[in-house]
Amino acid sequence: MRGLNQLWQNFLPRALFQKILWIFCEKGVRYKPSKSVLRGGKIYLGEVLMRFDIARAGSGLTYEIRNIVIVANKLRNLGVEVCWENIGDPVQKGEKIPDWMKEIIAGIIREDQSFAYSPTQGMNETREFIVEKVNRRGGVQISPDDIIFFNGLGDAIARSYSSIRSDARVIVPEPTYSTHFLAEVLHASFPPNTYRMNPYQGWQPDLKELEQKVKSHNSIVGILVINPDNPTGYVYPEEHLRQIVQIAKTYDLFLIFDETYINMVYNGAKTVYLSDVVGDVPAISMKGISKEFPWPGARCGWMEIYNADKDETFARYIDTILKQKMSEVCSTTLPQLAIPRIMTHPEYENYLVQRLMHYERLSNIAYNILKDVPCLIVNRTDGAFYMTAVFNEAFLNNRQYLPIKHESVRNFVEHLVSQNIELDKRFVYYLLGATGICVVPLTSFFTSLQGFRMTLLEKDEEKFTWIVKTIAESVVEYIESAR
C-alpha cells in the first residue's frame, strides 16, 4: 500500500491517533513511523506498509555496468565529455556493421515469416544448423530438441537459475559477470558460493578451492564457468576444462558454461568448446550473437543442452526451463532466421578475424601501458574484449582524490564518494569526474578485489592509447594524493 501521508490537525488527541495506528495493526497493516509524525504542531500519519515485505532478497542489488551510466550522464549534463569504457557494446563504440550483413537482415525482413511467432524452442532450421555445427566437431552429440532460444542470454540466465530449487546452489567464479551473480542470489536469497580467479596467477581459477567447496557443501548442484571469462579476459586451457568436468562427474553436479566469447580468442591462446570435453556429464552451454556478430540489440541467445537423456533429475530441470519458456510463447524470430545466413556467408570468417586482430592490438597496448603502473596487478587479456586491473589494497584509502577543475563536477563527485562506498568505486568516480573516462569498479563483479574493468572496443587506436595512458597517470596521481 502506498503511504497515506494524511495530515491530522492538532485538534486530534494523541491518544486517538495512537488508537488509529493500533486499528491499522489489528487489520494486518504495518505502520512505519515517519520522522515527521509530530512537526510544527501537526501530526502526520506517516507511512502505512503492505501486510509484509513483498520484495525478494536481493532487491537492493545493483547492476553497476549500467548504474555507472546514470552517474556519467549526470556529469555530461555538467559539461563532462565522457569516454564510455564501461559496457561491452561494439556497435556503441563505433563498430561498423558490414553491408553484406545488413543486406541479409534486410532480405529477411521482406519475408513474412520474420513477422510470425517462432516455435517455442526456436526456429527449426536454425536449431538444425547449430546441431550440425556441434555434432561435426565429434564431441557430445545433440538433436534440435536440445536447443532452446531466448531473448538474449540475460533471459536464458534468469530462466536457468530461477528453475533451480531455492536450497540448491550453483558455485560461481569470483569475480563473476554480474548477471550470473544476480540470478544466483535472487533464486536462493543468500550470498553465493564462489571459487577464486587468481590475479597473481594470470586469473587462473583455483580448482583446488573449487573441489574443496563442492565436496564440503552438499547444497552445491552446479558449477558456472565463463569461457573466455568476463570480466577478466582469461581463456581456459583444455586441461582446466577437463579438470572441471571431472569435478562435476565425481560429485554428481551439472555444468553451466557461458560461452558467449568462445570464438573470440587471440594472442595465441587456445581453448575448446564444452561439447568437446563434457563426456556424459549433464551440462548447459550458453551462446549468443550479441558480441560475435555483433548484434547486441537483437537480444538473441540460446542454450545447448548436453546429456539430459542420461540423468532424470537434470531432465526434469530442463523441462522446467522449457515450460517457463512456453509461457512467453517464443523468442524473437528475425535474429534466429539471420544466424545460419550470416555465419555461412563467405565474408563472415574474415570479418571476425579482422575484429580479433583489433582486440589483440588493443589488449597489448593496454597491457604494456598498465603493467608497469605501481600498485596495479595487470594480466594481458587473451579473450573477449575486456581488460581488468586490480589495485594492491594496501595502497587504497578514503582520503585519496583526483583534482577536478569544475566546481559543480567536483561537488557532485565529492557527494558521491562521501557515502561510504567501496574504495575502487571511489577511484572510478574521481576518474570519471576528472578525465571523463568511464570504467566499472571491479567490486561490482562481486569480489573483494579492488580494481576496475575497461573495454577493448575503441576503434581509434590513438584515442585508445590516450585513454589507457590517462588511466595509468590517474592511478599514480590518485595513489600519491594522500601521501
Question: PLM features: residue spans?
Answer:
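Conserved glycine-rich beta-strand-loop-beta hairpin in the small C-terminal domain of fold type I
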Residues: 336, 356-367, 377-394, 401-415, ...
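N-terminal small-domain helix-loop-helix segment of the aminotransferase-like
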Residues: 49-152, 159, 206-209, 342-345, ...
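Short, Lys/Arg-enriched N-terminal segments with co-localized hydrophobic residues
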Residues: 31, 35-49
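Conserved core of the PLP fold type I
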Residues: 113-247, 256, 262-277, 284, ...
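PLP-dependent enzyme catalytic core of the Aspartate aminotransferase-like
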Residues: 42-47, 132, 136, 140-141, ...
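Conserved core segment of the aminotransferase class I/II
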Residues: 103, 276-360, 364-373, 377, ...
